[in-house]
Regions:
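Short cysteine-rich clusters marking metal-coordination/redox-active sites
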Residues: 8-11, 63-66, 91-94, 109-112
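A broadly conserved detector of short glycine/acidic/proline-rich loop/turn motifs that flank catalytic sites
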Residues: 76, 104, 122
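Short Cys/His-rich micro-motifs in 6-15 aa windows
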Residues: 68-72, 112-122
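Short, compact, well-ordered microdomains
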Residues: 97-118
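His-enriched metal-coordination microenvironments in redox/metal-binding proteins
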Residues: 1-6, 123-125
């Protein structure tokens, strides 16, 4: 189950994000909606007995072009040899690359760079 978080900064920037994952995070059909080519690779390797686990969750990321923080689907699977394949989303506003937030507890504000705080609004699934 994921969390609905409200991130706030003293500069006035705030955003509500759905972080983490829900029940659909292990549903191959749902993952394929977001990552069709990558899911084909997963299914092929899983059928060959090479996949240990897989999951899709919303990652909190920055778009440097838009100066926004967002939570978007990311998909990863770990093979039995220990190698992890990771696939993130692109910005839905500009199609640019995203940078994953390193510290979800107090990330830097995308507008001013100060540390942000969050509180949990609820859960989502």
């Amino acid at each position: 189950m994921g969390e609905i978080r409200k991130y706030t900064c003293t500069c006035g920037y705030e955003t509500d994000l759905r972080a983490g994952g829900g029940l659909a995070g292990c549903n191959i059909g749902m993952i394929a909606n977001f990552f069709p080519k990558e899911t084909e690779a997963l299914v092929k390797e899983r059928n060959e007995g090479r996949v240990k686990r897989y999951v899709m969750e919303n990652e909190i990321s920055y778009c440097n072009n838009c100066q926004e923080m967002m939570a978007l689907p990311a998909f990863s699977y770990t093979r039995k040899d220990g190698y992890t394949c990771h696939f993130g989303s692109r910005c839905p506003l500009c199609a640019g690359e995203l940078t994953q937030v390193e510290d979800e507890e107090s990330p830097a504000c995308p507008k001013c760079g100060k540390k942000m705080r969050y509180f949990v609004l609820g859960d989502w699934d």
